[in-house]
Amino acid sequence: GNRIVKVGKSLKSNSATVIDLSDKTVLPGLIDGHTHICLTPDYSSNPPVLYKTNTYRTMEAFKAAKRILNAGFTTIRDVDNEGADMADIAVRDAINEGMFVGPRIFVSGWAISITGGHMNLTGLRPSIDKKVEQLAIIADNSEDMVAAIRDQRKSGVDFIKIYATGTLRHINRETLEPLSQLSTEEVQIMVNEARRWDMDVAAHAYGGTGALHA
């Protein structure tokens, strides 16, 4: 099972499998509150959305989940699928259905960003820019933001991920603070919609006004 029922000496159960760990040190399962099972080492130089199929990326995510479990983490919060479509959802569901052993996973699916923001691929020729798959859902107005959250809920995510700022590459050159990608009103719109569906919202925020808005 997944629940500790009793702790003590001389406990007996007719149905339990007994494992002698008297010479071992036993720890409770660890929890990783922010990880990315779809993120691979080659990500920064070659965005996998451009050359890897989502099927292949799902297999990579399976491998990552197994490695995480072997490291002692029995629960993880996967924050953004890195443009791998429903790979994180597939891995979570396969584990929950007993298809293979892995950690308990809570997933956000696609993150939500803006045009020109973090996870929106830049530097592409205008003729192909709109045709290339992105690393996140790009939403520039309240209608698109609400629709994105509803689509994510329909897909079966556990919570919503938004990009309130970019990375340290997107900073104010005078204050060195991360640039805010979303207004307070935009953040509130998405939080309100997520709450309607009983979902939490995780915000990528390196600091500055973006973090305050979140």
Name each model feature, range by range.
Residues A90, S142-A214:
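Histidine/acidic residue-rich metal-binding segments in metalloenzymes
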Residues G29-T35, I76-D78, I105-G109, I160-I162, ...:
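Hydrophobic faces of well-ordered beta-strands that scaffold small-molecule active sites
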Residues D42, N81, W110, T165, ...:
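Short, ordered loop/turn segments at secondary-structure junctions
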Residues K24-M99, T115, E185, H213-A214:
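Metal-associated gating/positioning segment near the N- to mid-region
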Residues N46-M59, T122-A147, L179, D200-Y206:
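Active-site mouth loops of central-metabolism enzymes
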Residues D42-L50, M99-Q134:
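Metal-cofactor-binding active-site regions of metalloenzymes
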